[in-house]
Regions:
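Generic N-terminal initiation segments characterized by hydrophobic and/or small/turn-forming residues
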Residues: 9-10, 40
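Short, positively charged and aromatic/hydrophobic N-terminal segments
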Residues: 4-9, 15-19
Length: 301
């Protein structure tokens, strides 16, 4: 669309505003309760209703947060029947706050929000299922405003989704991310079976020369062996007006995450190669782009 703007009696300028450019915002999953890192938004987990988070907040702590940053809440647990009362009470309380969105895995979250007519935006976050725009559009038409895109599809597929949906996209861009989740306490069962004792919060699995962090809390989670580093792809996502990218600070020290955040905020085509190398050095050269440039092929061994 062309708009004429009259500057004075003799000059007319023509502006093409057919495409509006938005800023791609940075969401951080923090590994501490102090929200003192300069990002656009935080994704916070709530005790007993979230999984795969480095740190968990109580509802009262959420209520007392004083920040100008956007706050997303993760209620991404696969809920049990005995979770539903707490879940409903929590959603009611969260609907009274200035929450940007609720990440959910269990469809029960959506059902409760619709049944109670709660005014709270939702984020479809069924990690390994958010792979195509047709399903994303289905949930968008059900009232789900955002989608956390799977880490298991290529950059071009993410961009294709963006071109074919009205859903606001949140794309994982850096950090360790969950690769496998089990309701069973696999580490605890292993220790019990062999009469071993280990009070470590985080353990590691060695497999074919790679090391995978494993956390056994309310569920057992195995994380990727390397950090996802998508800073190069981030520039392309910005060009495509993708609304958010997600950084997970799990096992990254505060000083390092600050350096990385600053690079994401100042990256350009001119410094991208330098920044990519710097992030690799910061993360001990243990980085990968995973499926961003690989076809999604699963092999059973």
């Amino acid at each position: 669309m062309l708009i004429k703007i009259k500057i004075d009696k003799t000059n007319l300028f023509m502006y093409n505003i057919s495409k509006v450019i938005y800023m791609t915002k940075l969401i951080l999953i923090p590994n501490k309760k102090e929200l003192d890192i300069d990002v656009d938004a935080y994704l916070l987990g709530i005790k007993d209703l979230s999984v795969n988070m480095p740190v968990y907040f109580t509802l009262e702590e959420i209520k007392n947060i004083n920040t100008d940053k956007e706050i997303f809440i993760s209620l991404n647990k696969n809920m049990h029947s005995n979770d539903l009362k707490l879940l409903e009470q929590t959603l009611i309380e969260l609907s009274k706050l200035k929450i940007k969105g609720i990440f959910f895995y269990d469809i029960g979250v959506l059902n409760i929000v619709k049944r109670l007519n709660l005014n709270i935006p939702l984020v479809w976050a069924q990690e390994h299922m958010t792979t195509n725009y047709e399903t994303i559009n289905f949930w968008y038409n059900e009232g789900v405003e955002y989608t956390q895109v799977s880490e298991e599809i290529k950059e071009e597929e993410i961009i294709n989704i963006k071109h074919n949906t009205k859903s606001k996209l949140i794309v994982p861009i850096l950090g360790y991310f969950p690769m496998f989740v089990s309701r069973r306490h696999l580490k605890e069962n292993y220790l019990r079976e062999f009469n071993l004792k280990d009070n470590s919060k985080i353990n590691y699995i060695e497999k074919e020369g790679k090391t995978y962090p494993i956390v056994d809390e309310n569920v057992t989670t195995v994380y990727t062996s390397s950090y996802l580093n998508g800073i190069k792809e981030y520039l392309n996502f910005k060009k495509e007006n993708i609304e958010y990218v997600l950084i997970n600070s799990f096992l990254i020290e505060a000083e390092k995450i600050n350096e990385i955040i600053n690079m994401f905020k100042t990256v350009t085509n001119e410094n991208i190669e330098e920044y990519n190398k710097e992030i690799s050095n910061i993360l001990d050269n243990n980085i990968d782009t995973f499926f961003l440039h690989k076809d999604t092929i699963y092999k059973v061994k």
